[in-house]
Amino acid sequence: MDSLDEEQIGALQKAFDSFDTDSKGFITPETVGVILRMMGVKISEKNLQEVIAETDEDGSGELEFEEFVELAAKFLIEEDEEALKTELREAFRVYDKEGNGYITTDVLKEILRELDNRLTEEDLDSIIEEVDEDGSGTLDFNEFMEMMNG
């Protein structure tokens, strides 16, 4: 549960409670699929069954709230990472004006200045030196992603 924020856990609790109509403290695997689809998660029935089997620690065939949160977290975190990658790809594309698959280190300096205007020229040079390992003066998308993800 550490990987989700309070708001996400609260939303999951509401969904869980609204489907646990008898207040038994668990929901069925079918219900899990319904909730995930309502949250916009696309998952095949086969994958859903596999994930439920992995998550159903006590083997009851039903999911208690903690098990449900653990299962849902896998999808919510994956979705966030995918969204971030899409945003970074779009940012890279905007700065890759010629569409040749790379940006120059000068363009990277511009991006870094926009992200943090407190960076000195020395800071920028140090960052560039670290990310442009081959000294080519350019960064392709993978190098850019590596830098942005730390």
Curated annotation (Swiss-Prot):
Positions annotated to bind Ca(2+) 2: D132, D134, S136, T138, E143
Listed SUPFAM superfamilies: EF-hand (SSF47473)
Annotated Ca(2+) 1 binding sites: D56, D58, S60, E62, E67
Protein keywords: Acetylation, Calcium, Metal-binding, Muscle protein, Repeat
Family annotation (Pfam families): EF-hand_7
Transmembrane segment boundaries: none
GO cellular component, one term: myosin II complex
Keyword Acetylation: yes
Residues covered by the EF-hand domain: 7-42, 43-78, 83-118, 119-150
Entry superkingdom: Eukaryota
GO terms assigned for molecular function: calcium ion binding
In-chain residues carrying the UniProt-annotated modification N-acetylmethionine: M1
Further facts: There are three different troponin C in lobster. This protein binds two calcium ions.
Protein's job: Troponin is the central regulatory protein of striated muscle contraction. Tn consists of three components: Tn-I which is the inhibitor of actomyosin ATPase, Tn-T which contains the binding site for tropomyosin and Tn-C. The binding of calcium to Tn-C abolishes the inhibitory action of Tn on actin filaments.
Assigned protein family: Belongs to the troponin C family.
Name of the protein: Troponin C, isoform 2A
Native source organism of the sequence: Homarus americanus (American lobster)
